[in-house]
Amino acid sequence: MRKNIAASVSNLTVKYNDDLILDNISFSVAQNEIFVILGGSGSGKSTLLRHMVGLENPLSGQVFIDDINITECAEKQFYTALNKIGVLFQSSALISSMTVGENVALPIAEFTNFSKKSIEKMVHVKLSLVGLENYENYLPSEISGGMKKRAGLARALALNPAILFLDEPSAGLDPVTAAEIDELILDINKKLGTTIIIVTHELASIFAVAKRVIMLDKSTKSIIAEGTPDELKNNCDNPYVCKFFNRRTNNTNTDLININT
């Protein structure tokens, strides 16, 4: 077992038809770390996430969840690895015809043999964790966008994953609600010790939660920077990284904006 490594990617190359999407990507994520995959639109960050959670196979390279190589392992090992992860996609993907509680209960009912009463207790615990206590009976259409994100987080946490993958968790949210989601991510990491891997281009969220960041570049299809948010902010050896991290609105030093290019 690779000591203190929750997940890693080694020499990952991805092509769709003849188009190169990711080129020779390698990095590792420590246990209990909040790790951000950063890049503008078209940089391949969501593609990388899909490969890390086993939804797609690369042209070459390896993805490890804990010590299991999910790109080459047997089916039984593959599902063992998947049991270690939870995923929240950008849309939150709640089933509209099911209540919030039923959405959160879905993976528990599908992958365990717990009784209905036990599942109800687990759902209550998860919803309380994300600040949605007593929202079990609401439909997704009856709650706000921020609440949908919280419900999606509760469902992603339903089976107590060691690693939580979040795809643009604050996308489409107003700044106040986005900051609340950032606080929730920090709280989950602290209380549960969950390793959290986030795909985003939201600079405010990166500085709020990330311990370490990799930055993908659309033109080279590769990692062009890696480090803490402050290290990347001060990395002006690379003009693109410098521009991405140091643009301001209204010529102030505090109001970071997104460069989604």
State where each predicted segment sits.
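Helix-to-loop junction immediately C-terminal to a conserved catalytic motif
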Residues: 53
